[in-house]
């Protein structure tokens, strides 16, 4: 058993392993998003066609949203495993 953290139910090695797996998956997917973002940004920078530029700009916005949602999804999954005790 791991030393307790205030506001959370007791942690176990199993719970820590699950949360580490969640965080590893988050990092891997985040790196894919970053690579796509760089690819689309470069394409936008070199684009002379306004319609294609609009599409690349939209893709950049979508990837920004995806990255934000990825962080949120990871946070909720970690909370599900660690089960915080809300006392307010």
From Swiss-Prot:
Signal peptide: none annotated. Keywords: Nucleotide-binding. 3',3'-cGAMP binds at residues 8-9, 11, 23, 79, 82. It comes from the Viruses. Pfam families: Acb2_Tad1_hairpin (PF24729). Disruption phenotype: Decreases the titer of this phage in E.coli about 50-fold. GO terms for molecular function: nucleotide binding. Changing residue 33 to A: Still inhibits host CapV phospholipase, binds cGAMP, about 50% hexamerization. Changing residue 66 to D: No longer inhibits host CapV phospholipase, no longer binds cGAMP, does not hexamerize. Belongs to the Acb2 family. Homohexamer when bound to 3',3'-cGAMP. Antagonizes CBASS (cyclic oligonucleotide-based antiphage signaling system). Binds and sequesters host-produced 3',3'-cyclic GMP-AMP (cGAMP) with a dissociation constant of about 30 nM; each homohexamer binds 3 cGAMP molecules with 1 cGAMP molecule binding to 2 monomers. Sequestration of cGAMP inhibits the cGAMP-activated phospholipase activity of host CBASS effector protein CapV. This is Anti-CBASS protein 2. It comes from Enterobacteria phage T4. The lineage of its organism: Viruses, Duplodnaviria, Heunggongvirae, Uroviricota, Caudoviricetes.
């Amino acid at each position: 058993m791991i030393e307790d953290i205030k506001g959370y139910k007791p942690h176990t090695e199993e719970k820590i392993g699950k949360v580490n797996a969640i965080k590893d998956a988050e990092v891997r997917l985040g790196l894919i998003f970053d690579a796509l973002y760089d690819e689309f940004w470069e394409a936008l920078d070199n684009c002379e066609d306004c319609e294609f530029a609009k599409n690349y700009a939209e893709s950049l916005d979508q990837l920004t949203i995806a990255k934000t949602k990825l962080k949120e999804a990871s946070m909720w999954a970690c909370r599900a495993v660690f089960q915080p005790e809300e006392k307010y």
